[in-house]
Curated annotation (Swiss-Prot):
This is Methyl-coenzyme M reductase I subunit beta. One of its GO terms (biological process) is methanogenesis. Pfam families: MCR_beta, MCR_beta_N. It comes from the Archaea.
Length: 443
């Protein structure tokens, strides 16, 4: 039996209806098979840069910047022997021959997509098994393939896994995961939020609605892990996931379509308020001179509508600029305006607006330490909104036309080449909506 009475209509990224009257819980990370698969896949998947390993050994440049050990060069044809190396690595990574291990070569043997078997995570406290098991297997496979001596084996390890354990992170490694190392988490349950915006944008090949969907899945699934989406707050997070990230009832798409040509953040707000009135989410509570104060009997649904409006406003504003840099201002002033317009709380009850103040400072202003694309939901500046800010940043970076110094191409090239090959990472909206439609009658 369903916990909640809410039902939504689900659409694809072109605004076409896929399924009507889907129970809200069919989009829950606890119930939706595609979301479960995406989350498990992100934990299990590792990108291996075989060409990078070969070049690192050839030049003896290992362990990060300014590390060249002259006299320790190794000229190994790793790319040319990629098939043999990958087969040997897979044999070490797998638990049984018929498990869900995957080692797939890409780009003519220059890259490898590795998915560590689920069985390894059944006996793991967290997700470090993916990069560490993969790295160790490829190190041994390369050593065995080329009969590397015991005196040169450490160079192979350094070329694959970098400076670790002398460094906390895998500095200079030629492997990549979307999840960052556990030591960088701001607190318990933050792992799925600790994924750079640019990684999400790269994996979805800069498709705006898909990037927003993947970011929302990660952020809102983290809320279940953190204990935020429990009890009285579960419905609020599910509605946010549905409307802001999954384009429920085509709300985001409709707002962008209506405002895309000549609209502004303000016109999106006007349309959003009108839609909320039509749908009975809000009502006029008090009429003053030339001003209406609105009220609602369903704050969680109002928050979902406001969050969808915020996503649409981001797409309209950053899309018009073809630049992501202004996304912090959109996050801030959309909420400022909607609070004045309605008398109701902004998205996430003020937490997005508050996040945007610090985000503006740290991506612009006196400090200006990095562009929007290098932030994540675990970052000390942007962690405060519980799942409603970072998806808009992902949408903004997907719309950016190359204005950023820290672009997805610059920070996330290996992620793009490898992770985008996984259909569910590249088109999460499609697979989550289809899965929700399949299980709707089971809820």
């Amino acid at each position: 039996m369903a916990k909640f009475e809410d039902k939504v209509d689900l659409y694809d990224d072109r605004g076409n209806l896929v399924e009507e009257q889907v129970p809200l819980e069919a989009l829950s990370p606890l119930r939706n098979p595609a979301i479960k698969s995406i989350v498990q896949g992100i934990k299990r998947t590792v990108a291996v840069n075989l060409e990078g390993i070969e070049n690192a050994l050839k030049t003896a440049k290992v362990g990060g910047p300014a590390c060249k050990i002259m006299g320790r060069e190794l000229d190994l044809d790793i790319v040319g022997n990629a098939e043999s190396i990958a087969a040997a690595a897979k044999e070490m990574i797998q638990v049984t021959e018929d498990d869900d291990t995957k080692v797939e070569l890409l780009g003519g043997g220059k890259r490898a997509l590795v998915q560590v078997p689920s069985a390894r995570f059944d006996v793991a406290a967290e997700y470090s098994a993916a990069p560490l098991v993969t790295a160790t297997a490829f190190v041994q496979a390369i050593i065995n393939e080329f009969d590397v001596s015991m005196y040169d084996a450490n160079m192979v390890k350094a070329a694959v896994l970098g400076r670790y354990p002398q460094s906390v992170e895998y500095m200079g490694a030629n492997i990549a995961t979307m999840l960052d190392i556990p030591q960088k988490l701001e607190g318990p349950g933050y792992a799925l939020r600790n994924i750079m915006v640019n990684h999400v944008v790269a994996a979805t090949l800069k498709n705006t609605l898909q990037a927003a969907a993947l970011s929302t899945i990660l952020e809102q699934t983290a809320m279940f892990e953190m204990g935020d989406a429990v009890g009285a707050f579960e419905r609020m997070h599910l509605l946010g996931l549905a409307y802001q990230g999954m384009n429920a009832d085509n709300l985001v798409f409709d707002l962008v379509k209506a405002n895309g040509k000549e609209g502004t953040v303000g016109s999106v707000i006007a349309d959003l308020v009108e839609r909320a009135l039509e749908d009975g989410v809000i009502k006029v509570e008090k009429e003053l001179t030339d001003y209406k104060v609105y009220g609602t009997d369903d704050l969680a649904m109002w928050n979902a509508y406001a969050a969808a409006g915020l996503m649409a406003a981001t797409m309209v504003n950053q899309g018009a600029a073809r630049a992501a840099q202004g996304v912090s201002s959109t996050l801030l002033y959309y909420n400022d305006l909607i609070e004045f317009e309605t008398g109701l709380p902004g998205v996430d009850f003020g937490k997005v607006e508050g996040t945007a103040v610090g985000f503006s400072f740290f991506s612009h202003s006196i400090y200006g330490g990095g562009g929007p694309g290098i932030f994540n939901g675990n970052h000390i500046v942007t962690r405060h909104s519980k799942g409603f800010a970072i998806p808009c940043v992902a949408a903004a970076m997907a719309l950016d036309a190359g204005t950023q110094m820290f672009s997805p191409e610059a920070t996330s090239g290996l992620i793009k080449e490898v992770f985008s090959q996984v259909d569910e990472f590249r088109e999460p909206l499609k697979y989550v909506v289809e899965a929700a439609a399949e299980i709707k009658n089971e809820i």
